[in-house]
Amino acid sequence: MLFRSPFVGAGSVFLNTDFSRYILADINSDLISLYNIVKMRTDEYVQAARELFVPETNCAEVYYQFREEFNKSQDPFRRAVLFLYLNRYGYNGLCRYNLRGEFNVPFGRYKKPYFPEAELYHFAEKAQNAFFYCESYADSMARADDASVVYCDPPYAPLSATANFTAYHTNSFTLEQQAHLAEIAEGLVDRHIPVLISNHDTMLTREWYQRAKLHVVKVRRSISSNGGTRKKVDELLALYKPGVVSPAKK
């Protein structure tokens, strides 16, 4: 069975499932480039990245030098090395870009950022059965067939109209795209391809996923821009399973 994820993100579902093959996509080209480099050049990558995880690099001056280098670099390998450093040393683990496509997360001021060497090797081993593509969710899902299962973990819909959200990439995910994702899922399940979507449990998401079988789980999430406020919120799992979905609205 082929597992397809149009929003691979950090890859936690990929790393904790056991399918024979994976097709994993994301709109963030830096992320996909890193994954492909870790997959193909594991030892070289780990050695280069380890050199940045030293006490001398854990200061604002060096961080901003590396951030500037990352934004100017055209070398995929060097960018991938710096991308991991910026993710670990940047504020709150954010991945954020300005409208010019420049990484703009400030320095995080952590005592000793963790170098994930064992996790990189585990990822590389698991990735031998995976293919990574930089593409939109629509393009990724368009290639799904009846040998696939599709899991979608999109940027979550706001919990309220005043919720403070920052763009994961320069292409922020709009409410129209959220609704479009649900329409694509409906089209796939009508072709006997199962789809699971996770999102916040709101009136809007319930409207979007009204043809799906809905399950509610409680998860602990940061609910402020500084990451300091955490509480349990309801998360919605919308399962589009052939033979189970509600009929389309007339």
How should each PLM-predicted stretch be described?
Residues 10-21:
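Conserved SAM-binding loop of SAM-dependent methyltransferases across substrates and taxa
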Residues 39-166, 180, 187-191, 233:
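SAM-dependent nucleic-acid methyltransferase catalytic core
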Residues 146-234:
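Conserved acidic-Pro-Pro-aromatic motif
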Residues 242-250:
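Flexible, glycine-/basic-rich loop-and-beta segments that form/coincide
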